[in-house]
Each structure stands twice: as structure tokens, then as C-alpha cells.
């Protein structure tokens, strides 16, 4: 864990939501995987971890050979402000690596009111907000979930929309 992160945790409410290390968290050797996926939920840890679809997809993606899927949640306002003040980019709970260093940033979006949180997470991560500003060196930004039946409001911010039930979707987009 980053020393800067250790310094700010005592100043926020519910710091345990930002440190990972739970039972059944999937850890892999990042030098032995081909693709790293930051699986992001645009709400707090407690809301995201109670989402059955997120838990299922986390397991499905981690069962793909050569893929390590890590979790990331939107920080609460106090933590977001502390992270911005300390220049700590949004990170994954398993490795604490910044999600901007991943190959894919995948959002699970269940409702339209989460769209602003998704954009805020990209900003906090240091990822160019608009898909047109990204290069081959930045992660592919993917969004799925029930809100993707109307993905037009966030079309400028994502590279790929996955429409349909993620649990039943083929893993082909990740394997590409």
C-alpha cells in the first residue's frame, strides 16, 4: 500500500472500504498475466459488493486464463478529496495499482444516475475523459450493465458498450 494512502486513511470515514484484503479476493502474479482488467463499480464499496452481478463477473473474468480482474469502487466524497489533495490516482483494491495502468477499465452500470460517477472515476484515475483523446497507450474503457440499453449519454466517454446480461455474455470481448 502506498505511504500516501496510509497517511490519508485515518482522516476518512469508513477507511476499511479502501484497503481490500477480504476473504476470497483473487490475487494473481501480475507478471504472469497477459491482460489486467479494472472492474469498476460507480458507487461505494458497500453498494458494489452487494451487487450479485458484479461478484459473478469478477469470478468469470478471473477464470479466463491470462486475465487478472481487480475491483475498484467510487470513493466517498471525503476520500475523493483526500486522494485529489495527495495526488493519489484511483486504484484497484487487490494490487493498489492505479487503474490507468490497466489494459481494460470495465464499468458495471446499473442505472443512469451512475453516469456522472463513472466520469468522475475516470477523471480521478487520470484517464482522458473522452474516448477521442485516448491513445493505444491508455486503457480501453468498456461499460456494461442494464443502463447500457441507453448508452448514448456516455458514448463520448467509453470505447465500447456491452449491451445485454453480462453474466450470460460470452467472454470474447475480454479475450480479444
What label would you give each PLM region?
Residues 1-14, 64:
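Helix-enriched interaction subdomains in cytosolic or periplasmic regions
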Residues 1-7, 45, 139-141:
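N-proximal accessory regions
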Residues 37, 42, 48-59, 63, ...:
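Low-complexity, highly charged intrinsically disordered N-terminal segments
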Amino acid at each position: 500500500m502506498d505511504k500516501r494512502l496510509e497517511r490519508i486513511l485515518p482522516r476518512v470515514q469508513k477507511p476499511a472500504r479502501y484497503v481490500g484484503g477480504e476473504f476470497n479476493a483473487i490475487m494473481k502474479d501480475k507478471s504472469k498475466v497477459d491482460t489486467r482488467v479494472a472492474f469498476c463499480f460507480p458507487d461505494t464499496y458497500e453498494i458494489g459488493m452487494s451487487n450479485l452481478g458484479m461478484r459473478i463477473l469478477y469470478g468469470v473474468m478471473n477464470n479466463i486464463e491470462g486475465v487478472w480482474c481487480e475491483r475498484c469502487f467510487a470513493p466517498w466524497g471525503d476520500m475523493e478529496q483526500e486522494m485529489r489533495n495527495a495526488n493519489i490516482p484511483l486504484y484497484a483494491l487487490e494490487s493498489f495499482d492505479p487503474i490507468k495502468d490497466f489494459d481494460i477499465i470495465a464499468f458495471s452500470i446499473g442505472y443512469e444516475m451512475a453516469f456522472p460517477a463513472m466520469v468522475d472515476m475516470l477523471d480521478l484515475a487520470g484517464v482522458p475523459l473522452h474516448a477521442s483523446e485516448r491513445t493505444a497507450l491508455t486503457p480501453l474503457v468498456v461499460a456494461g450493465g442494464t443502463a447500457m440499453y441507453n448508452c448514448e449519454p456516455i458514448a463520448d466517454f467509453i470505447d465500447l458498450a456491452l449491451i445485454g446480461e453480462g453474466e450470460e455474455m460470452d467472454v470474447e470481448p475480454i479475450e480479444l
